[in-house]
Amino acid sequence: MVLGCSNDDSPTNADTDNDTIFDNTDNCPNVSNEDQLDTDGDGLGDACDEDDDNDGILDENDNCPLTANPLQEDADNDGLGDACDNNTILPQFPCENGLANGHPCSGFDLMSHIPIADLGGAGAEGNDSWGWTDPQTGIEYALMCTTTNTAFVDISDPSNPIIVGTLPTATANSPWRDVKVYNNHAFVVSEAPGHGMQVFDLTRLRSVTNPPETFTADANYNGFGSAHNIVINEESGFAYAVGSDTFNGGPHFVNIQNPTSPIAAGGYAEDAYSHDAQVVTYNGPDADYIGREILIGSNENEVVIVDVTDKTNPVQISTIDYGNLGYAHQGWFTDDMVYFLLGDEVDEINFGLNSRSIVFNFSDLDNPEYHMEYLGPTSAIDHNGYVVGNTFYVANYTAGLRAIDISSLDSGVMTEVGYLDTFIPNDNTAFNGAWNIYPFFESGNILVSDIDGGLFIVRPSN
């Protein structure tokens, strides 16, 4: 017997693709694939397998290339096969030929609609809305305010929503009711006299077995009577009631870190009545205010920026107004906190403008500057608007939900990219139609609360 040394250049030890796997054991000897992944177990690695799931459909044509689905079913026509699509829910009313169940649309499907009478009873009108995702179950809920109550709607199947229950008004009915969410609790205010702030534990919705139930509040805060709106900074655990009967209508501070034991924490009365606000723990371009709690108030005749970090000593940073000022109503920061997009509720009425959004540059909070304005395609009044990424979602009353691309704000360009009109009769300059938008669900569901129509659940069209 002759003993010898192995030859590293022999075919047995060759590694053509230099992936540290010898060719004789490599499931893709000519394509580097150190992980040797072979989804369909056919002995051919995914890196060089043109049909990874072995269903007879080449990957380049397969709508689920890693899951066998030879029939290529795609119920919602989104290009992703049912076999690997986690979202195959179909809208009740897809946007087709510019209409979704009679509602003018572009780029948005109407998943479903709940009439206002089902939510608030006969004669009710809709107003504000917000959303909550149960962290335990992942179920998404719509919180819809009406003149009579706050309704809680399970939208886990947005095409078949379920009204789980309602929380009646604390005192009288009112056209103005507002809700926000913190730490799995809803906080509700109203302009109804003596209403105060209702606190409702949203986890109670999990145990409802015979919907709809009529709920009672878990706590009531009576540091104010009526309030137009409520704002919450979820990072700090403070709520800010605005337009209340305290502090000259300025923000009324409430510590809600223990949600069912809210504690009065002061207020700010130095500027005009505050109609709405956004409060953030600042992380924008102005280094002077990083980490500070900043309130941006839409105060009828101006926009005010206030440092509210010290609740016992809030400090005005600056104010700004603008041309053709009618009523500074509500606004929202861009995600990077460079720009603030404001809606003026009566400029369309007073000055004959189309739906207008005013944009300020807030890079320097001490010296805010007017940046640009956007005019929409209709004369509808703009109401509440919110930013998600590069899209500004606005409730434009009679013109419904409008989606505006703001990716080119630096260049002074805003472009409408979609809409779903919840008010069919017209787009007139009137107080009918969409009051609020909630565009923050991870699923892509968007809520539209409508004065006349109730709750609309929409999604971008596939």
Question: Where do the language-model regions lie?
Answer:
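Extracellular calcium-associated, cysteine-rich motifs in secreted modular proteins
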Residues: D8-L90, P94, G102
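C-terminal motif of bacterial Sec signal peptides marking the signal peptidase cleavage site
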Residues: L3-G4
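Feature marking well-ordered beta-strand scaffolds used for ligand recognition
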Residues: N86-N462
